[in-house]
Amino acid sequence: MSWRSEHIWIELIAGSRKISNLCWAFILFLGSLGFFLVGTSSYLGRNLISFFPLQQIIFFPQGIVMSFYGIAGLFISSYLWCTISWNVGSGYDLFNRKEGIVCIFRWGFPGINRRIFLRFLLKDIRSVRIEVEEGIYAGRVLYMDIRGQRAIPLTRTDENLTPGEIEKKAAELAYFLRVPIEVF
């Protein structure tokens, strides 16, 4: 989503609160909880999951391995849920031609650097750059090339924009900022 006027362009960036992340976190939680309950059931000798026969799983070695995988999955699931609740990666890109500044803001993980805020002058922007990676995991990422600093990504690597969409976005941004486009 974006908002644009003659002198200001604000591009809102979606973070980790996506349907796919919610689905993966939910599936991983249920699967790892199931593994942990089966491993615990085999250790206790009681059936904690009614639709699964206990006699088929002995504690050593299957119960131990299932408990380990269940605990590992619960840790990964809790990491995903925390990332979703903190909305890591969300923020905005603000391009202000009137004041001659560019502000990039992103939410990070809790701590000292939770708020990531970058500010540049428009005159320091060398170009808008498109990087294309071909192969099985093909991707296109839009970067802003800043003098004296490394390139700053403006799109997510998992955004999967078509070549036409990334070209249109790069052309509009380059026209708005009055800088050239580079393709790598």
Swiss-Prot record:
It is a multi-pass membrane protein. It comes from the Eukaryota. Seems to be required for the assembly of the photosystem I complex. GO terms for cellular component: photosystem I; plastid thylakoid membrane. GO terms for biological process: photosynthesis. The chain crosses the membrane at residues 19-39, 57-77. Its main location: plastid. It comes from Cuscuta exaltata. It is found in: Plastid thylakoid membrane. Belongs to the Ycf4 family. This is Photosystem I assembly protein Ycf4.
